[in-house]
């Protein structure tokens, strides 16, 4: 709310001076000074976007590249879903190596499909776009991510064991027509966040910030932080 203008008058003077507070709305509000009313809030439509999720423009560009690669148009969506489902098993980082060829891409390997995606956006952003689709797919077939146990997930949290899990509830992602079969539980969300935190901690332990490779500086260590130094207190399971 803008503060009201203040009026001051010098002693012995009949002239008053009105001082307007910076940011006060002009008497005639138009353009960028227009004041919204209730009708705007009840009728306006917000276009949801997230920098963690591939945009519709990104998908259009990827679609064009895939067409040039001879991915069949009538199974292109299924090829995308298959790739993202595969990433739920193996990961969606830039370093992840895709395995084999899916059944919907006309013999084009998942690695080539992923390489085309990376020309437009990150693989994880692409996977985030289809996270709700993969979530429903896994639940329908009772088929959790392949590496859930290796990542330290409990059996009751195993369906959350993929690194783009946050996309399941992101409003910028593509939602199946029937919606989510079930929303992620609070325990699953906590497990996914904990797993992400552990990965970051381990990655930090494997990196170094040495300015010199002289042994007097590195003391013969490859990494800058020992595993013990990288250990932090994690939230309870």
Swiss-Prot record:
Region of interest: Disordered: 1-24
Subcellular location, principal: virion
Gene Ontology MF term list: structural molecule activity
Membrane-spanning ranges: none
GO CC annotation terms, alphabetical: helical viral capsid; ribonucleoprotein complex
Keyword Heme: no
Any Pfam family hit: Flexi_CP
PROSITE patterns noted in UniProt: POTEX_CARLAVIRUS_COAT
Keyword Ribonucleoprotein: yes
Function: Required for genome encapsidation. Forms ribonucleoprotein complexes along with TGB1 helicase and viral RNA.
Family: Belongs to the potexvirus capsid protein family.
Name of the protein this chain belongs to: Coat protein
